[in-house]
């Protein structure tokens, strides 16, 4: 009677080893895809079109040099400027011929969503922390793909000198797809 169990024991051990090996192979592939997607998409997040509003300061920044906003503009209690000088005072629904950028919901990201001063790992951890990002992974994909203020970065108009503003280093579609791949594969963060 012990003979069948002696035959089955190595087979069961091999099956367990195969299952573990398959799991180990699958997980790193997902992790690699996620990390590769994040490594590419973070170039957009670190671009001035995003960082100027995801600032850790009490004021917005502007331009590729990320200078303090003209006219002493401040963040304000709701991230829309101060009661005396709301963002919408100058920033209308569309880019203005004068060079003032526009969007119907122009505002700063909340301080909990500030990326300024963070390295790539810190940005990733901030994005994946629902308490700080205030978004689920699904909401983050939606935000990065469809929010008109995010998409403004690819249609930034001209600056105050009449020169075209620099766009992020890839298309909005490519960025959105990278965000999807990153989240679908576990939203992994670099070490």
Where are these regions (language model features)?
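N-terminal export/targeting leaders of redox proteins
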Residues: 1-42, 62, 73-78, 95-191
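Short, well-structured alpha-helical interface segments that form or flank functional binding sites
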Residues: 36, 48, 82-85, 174
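N-terminal, post-signal-peptide region of Sec/Tat-exported proteins
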Residues: 46-80
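The canonical Cys-X-X-Cys-His
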Residues: 48-57, 84-94, 179
């Amino acid at each position: 009677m012990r003979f069948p169990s002696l035959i089955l024991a190595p087979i069961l051990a091999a099956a367990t080893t195969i299952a573990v090996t398959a799991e180990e192979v699958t997980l790193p592939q997902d992790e690699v895809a996620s990390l590769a997607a994040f490594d590419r998409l973070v170039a957009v997040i670190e671009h001035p079109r995003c960082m100027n509003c995801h600032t850790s300061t009490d004021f917005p920044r502007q331009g590729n040099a990320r200078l303090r906003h003209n006219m002493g503009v401040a963040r304000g209690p709701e991230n829309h400027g101060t009661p005396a000088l709301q963002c919408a005072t100058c920033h209308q629904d569309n880019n203005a011929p004068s060079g003032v950028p526009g969007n119907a919901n122009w505002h700063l990201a909340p301080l909990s969503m500030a990326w300024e001063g963070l390295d790539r790992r810190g940005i990733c951890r901030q994005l994946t922390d629902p308490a700080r990002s205030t978004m689920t992974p699904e909401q983050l994909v939606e935000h990065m793909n469809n929010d008109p203020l995010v998409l403004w970065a690819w249609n930034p108009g001209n600056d105050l000198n009449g020169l075209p503003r620099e766009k992020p280093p890839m298309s909005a579609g490519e960025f959105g797809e990278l965000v999807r791949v990153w989240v679908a594969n576990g939203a992994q963060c670099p070490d």
